[in-house]
Amino acid sequence: ITNHIARTRGGPLGAQTPAEQALIDQWTLLAVTAVETPALEILNVQGAGGDKTPEGQGAIAINAEKLRRPLKRLEAHLADHSHLVGDRFTVADLNLAECLRYAQGHPTLLAEFPAVKAWLETCQSRAAFQRMWAARLAEPA
């Protein structure tokens, strides 16, 4: 949905050229195929208190390992770029940062990827993210 909105509404969040659209699609596909599922598994295991059991710790370790390959790719890109596409915040950053947020509770994973960690902090320091997060925290449990 986010890609559709960026594509139809335009603006700086969306692609400015066909090449940028291809890159947005590439990074979004990485987010939903290689990052989202293992990151959500880490979040869910931790949320259920599984990080305090050997089984849960094992599940977290397996899913962290699944994230290392896409994070290495992301780290390499972010070593030379401030953002994923066009050196500006786009829907690609939004999509991938949100999927990666699910794994932020892992105690050491992001420390292995300093450029990714810095990029994620930049994405989450945006006023729009801060407003969204405040609204989410204000929702009833």
Role assignments for model-derived ranges:
Residues 1-68, 82:
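GST-like domain detector, emphasizing the conserved glutathione-binding G-site
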Residues 2, 6, 25-28, 71, ...:
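Non-transmembrane alpha-helical segments in soluble domains
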Residues 11, 76-88, 127-132:
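Surface-exposed helix-capping loop/turn segments at secondary-structure junctions
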Residues 12, 61, 107-114:
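Structural helix-adjacent loops and short alpha-helical linkers that scaffold large soluble proteins
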Residues 34, 38-43, 84-109, 117-123, ...:
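GST superfamily/GST-like fold recognition
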Residues 134-141:
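Terminal-tail/helix-coil boundary detector
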